[in-house]
Amino acid sequence: MLTIGFVLAACGSSDKDKDNGKDNASGDKEGTEESADFSAAMVTDIGGVDDKSFNQSAWEGLQNWGAEHGLSRGNGFDYAQSNDKADYIPNLTRLVRDDYNLIFGIGFELKEDLTKIAEQYKDTHFAIVDDVIELPNVASITFKEHQGSFLVGVAAAKKTKTNKVGFVGGIDSPLINKFESGFIAGVKSVNPDIDVKVEYAESFGDAAKGKIIASNMYSSGIDIIYHASGGTGNGVFNEAKDIKKSDPDRELWVIGVDRDQHDEGKIGDHNVTFTSMVKRVDVAVEDVINQAMKGEHHGGELLEYGIEEDAISVATTNEEAMTDDIIEAVNEWKEKILNGDVDVPKTREETKAYVEGL
């Protein structure tokens, strides 16, 4: 039976400068006695550590932890890149044999293979991000993505001029349905008459497919697309920037995911990133490692991170696009969620009932 664990230390801390994509983490501190004998590693899903999204955020958390303790890649922490699903078991096995104290599987697609490895290596501690494995040596880390998606839905509803917005998902799954459901509920809470188009690429690593979907959506009059599709979302950004380059006066936007994807939207003097639903995977990864170092492994427990723990937020980096009235509306709805006045749906069935009740 899975138990609910407590989310501690790292949540709510201030943002740190991150080594985005570099292999080594460096710091002025010498490795502490506590960290000298502790090591952690992660296996990516197909998106990889440079996906500018979910996997990259997890890797940044691992790097941050390493930097805090004077460690470097290959000497205290590491990652194994998965280019195909067939890489999951070999990557997990290699890290086990390299004797890492805590091994993360990044993404729900690793669930089946991580379960097999965890059952085989019962003395090794594991953690899975974005899914649940009910084993005594696996901590399950999940996020309340529907909360953040609801809030960017509110922002999109306040921003759209065509009353048409889109959602691009990676793989049609219960996890990504949480993003879809929250987004639709947020949009409809502001204006039930706004049309929300939903399409899935069935991949987290197909930028070309993402670009095609975005092209069709923008051509249909949609002016804001929220993506929850990992590397596939790079194609959404590329299409938006291509359109903006050819028609600088056209107002169209992308809502990023997982990290603040402001930089991905830059095109000359413009930026097509409206906002991002920031999911602090880095915070969760670093937090769980720090707890494991103290002997608190949380195997068999579910650790949930949401807006209550400052692990889910809405980016306001694009100050020109995220105007004060939009930010005010987002904050008002955030308070309603925190106060329990709004129960954000996380499935299509719950979303249908929520919208019908507006």
Regions found by a protein language model. Give the residues of each.
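Sec-dependent N-terminal signal peptides
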Residues: 1-3
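C-terminal motif of bacterial Sec signal peptides marking the signal peptidase cleavage site
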Residues: 7-10
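Bacterial signal peptide processing site
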Residues: 12-15
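A residue-level marker of the well-folded mature domains of exported/periplasmic proteins
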Residues: 19-358
